[in-house]
Amino acid sequence: SVLDAVRVNFNVVKTEDDEPNQFDLEVYNLSKSTRTKFETTDNRVILQAGYASMGLKLLAIGDIVRGSTEFKQPDVITSVDCRDGGRALRDARASLSFEPNVPAKTMVEELVKKLNVDNIEIGFDLSGTFKNGWSFYGSARDGLNKLGSCFGFQWSVQNNTLQLTKKRTPSAREAVLLTPSTGMIGSPSRIDKTGNNLTKAKEEPGLKVKCLLNPALVPGDPVVIESADYPRGTYRIVKVAHI
C-alpha cells in the first residue's frame, strides 16, 4: 500500500556497522486494514521524505519488528518499529565450501545470495584468496564478518542494499557537500578522541554536524564539511539520524 497525505512522525538511525539500521514511525488515523499491515511482523516498510523543492527521496527501508495501535481521541496512532534487512540478517543461514584460491569477491557474493537483499555494492577492489580453501556453516551474517576480518572490509545494509567498504575507508561514491549554504545548521562539534567507540575502532577524532533533512547522507560514504570554524575537509559518515 502507498500512503500519502497522512501525518507521520519518524526517527531513523543508520550506522556503518553490521547491526541493522532501525527506524520508528508514528502514523496517524489509518484505516483498520492498513493498521493491520503495520502491525504484522516482517512486512516491509519503505519510507520516503523530502522538501517540496526536491520532492520525495528514499529515506529508509525496513522489515517490521513490532507494531501496535493506540487510541488517543481524536487520533488513532499506529507505532511501528522497523529494521533495515532485519529479517535477512536474523534468518539467513549458509552452508558453503570453496576450493583453494577462489577469489574473495566470489565467496562474498555467494554469501550475500543467502541474505535476499536487493543489491550488493562493493566500493573497492576486493581481492585475496584462501590457499587451502574455505568452508563455512552458520548465519550468513557471521560468515561475512569472518571474511571481513580476513580481507579487511566492513559491511552494512543500507536501504536493503549490502554495502562493502574497506575498513575505516569511505566508499567510492561522490561526496555530499555540507556547508551553511547547503543545509548545515549551526557549527560542527568535535567528537572527543577518548570516546569509547573511537578508541575501540582506532579512529581519529571526527565531527558531529546538524543539517536539514538530506537522504543522500549514507553511512560509509564520504562527506565534505566546511564552515567558518572548520576548513574544508573530507570525512567518512559513521552515523546518520533523521528525526
Where are these regions (language model features)?
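Juxtamembrane "anchor/assembly" segments of surface/extracellular structural proteins
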Residues: S1-T40, R83-R87, A175-I243
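Acidic, Ser/Thr- and Gly-enriched intrinsically disordered low-complexity segments
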Residues: V2-F10, G62, N116-E121, Q158
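Amphipathic, non-transmembrane alpha-helical segments in extracytoplasmic/periplasmic proteins
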Residues: E19, F23-N29, T41, C82, ...
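Surface-exposed cap/loop segments at beta↔alpha junctions
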Residues: L30-N116
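Residues that flank catalytic or metal-binding motifs in active/ligand-binding sites
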Residues: A60, N160, G233
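Short, compositionally biased
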Residues: I61-E70, R168-P170, R236-I243
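Short beta-strand-centered interaction patches in the first periplasmic/extracellular domains
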Residues: R66, D75-R87, L115-P188
